[in-house]
């Protein structure tokens, strides 16, 4: 697996005259799979994405501004270019979910979605059904692949949600389910993305609606590059070393 070091934000609008199939191709003609990661604030979405990309865990992050990352991965003999779109936390109001248009465009843009909740936050679990329904409404006429991820499995002493409830709900919604500890286990994180990529078929991608393809035209806010991620990882590691030394 090789991480592509040119981090950006959501895919550029396809060139004039390009076809739906062209929009599904990444660098070197490889099939491109676009994944949006959504969920409530504080559930570990950014940590999940960075863990998948770098195999590293960084405990502290700045509030997410919506970054997109790209890597290559080999799945069943095929090399895929994967774009993973991190998103800000979703809020809930009396009238339901609060999803701004930028988030809606991210979801429409995606070929698949990861819905993340934390076993330490029951409200994040309660969001799953509404969020899944919202995702499917933004993809009418198709069954978008979705994986539900229960994060922070290592924090059993503050658990508010039994992971079995997440499994049952995911099964009811027709989604795959993974219980993970982003801080302690990379393999489970990788498996969740691996399975999701397998569920995205070339036929499904090529049948994207014109509306879905137009959502590729999204402003490109500045996002961190690999050097920035490495810098933050070193800072987090240095902070841990200082803490141990001072004890």
UniProtKB/Swiss-Prot annotation:
Claim: Electron transport is one of the keywords in the record: no
Q: Which UniProt keywords apply?
A: GTP-binding, Hydrolase, Nucleotide-binding
Q: Which residues bind GTP?
A: 39-46, 86-93, 151-154
Q: Which GO terms describe its molecular function?
A: G protein activity; GTP binding; transforming growth factor beta receptor binding
Its EC number(s): 3.6.5.2
Domain of life, source organism: Eukaryota
Segments carrying the region annotation (Disordered) are 204-229
The processes (GO biological process) annotated in the record are: negative regulation of transforming growth factor beta receptor signaling pathway
Gene3D superfamilies, sorted? P-loop containing nucleotide triphosphate hydrolases
InterPro entries of this UniProt entry?
P-loop_NTPase (IPR027417), Ras-related_GTPase (IPR051065), Small_GTP-bd (IPR005225), Small_GTPase (IPR001806)
Which reactions is this enzyme annotated as catalysing?
GTP + H2O = GDP + phosphate + H(+)
Where are the stretches annotated Small GTPase-like?
A: 28-245
Family to which this protein belongs: Belongs to the small GTPase superfamily. Ras family.
Q: What is this protein called?
A: Ras-like protein family member 11B
Which species does the entry assign this protein to? Rattus norvegicus
């Amino acid at each position: 697996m090789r991480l592509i070091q040119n981090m950006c934000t959501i895919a550029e609008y396809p060139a004039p005259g390009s076809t739906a199939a062209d929009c599904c191709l990444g660098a070197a003609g490889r099939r491109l799979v676009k994944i949006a990661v959504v969920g409530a604030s504080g559930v570990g979405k950014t940590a999940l994405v960075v863990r998948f990309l770098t195999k590293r865990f960084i405990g502290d992050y700045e509030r997410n501004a919506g970054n997109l990352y790209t890597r290559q991965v080999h799945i069943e003999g095929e090399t895929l270019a994967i774009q993973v779109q991190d998103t800000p936390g979703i809020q809930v109001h009396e009238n339901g979910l609060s999803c701004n248009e930028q988030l809606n465009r991210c979801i429409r843009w995606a070929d698949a979605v990861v819905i993340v909740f934390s076993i330490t936050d029951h409200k994040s679990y309660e969001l799953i059904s509404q969020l899944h329904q919202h995702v499917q409404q933004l993809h009418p006429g198709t069954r978008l692949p979705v994986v539900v991820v229960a994060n922070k499995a290592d924090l059993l002493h503050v658990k508010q949600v039994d992971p079995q409830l997440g499994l049952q709900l995911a099964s009811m919604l027709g989604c795959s389910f993974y219980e993970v500890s982003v801080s302690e286990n990379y393999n489970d994180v990788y498996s969740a993305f691996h399975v999701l990529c397998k569920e995205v078929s070339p036929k499904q991608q090529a049948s994207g609606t014109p509306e879905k393809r137009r959502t590729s035209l999204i402003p490109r806010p500045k996002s961190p590059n690999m050097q920035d991620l490495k810098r933050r990882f070193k800072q987090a590691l240095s902070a841990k070393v200082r803490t141990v030394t001072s004890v």
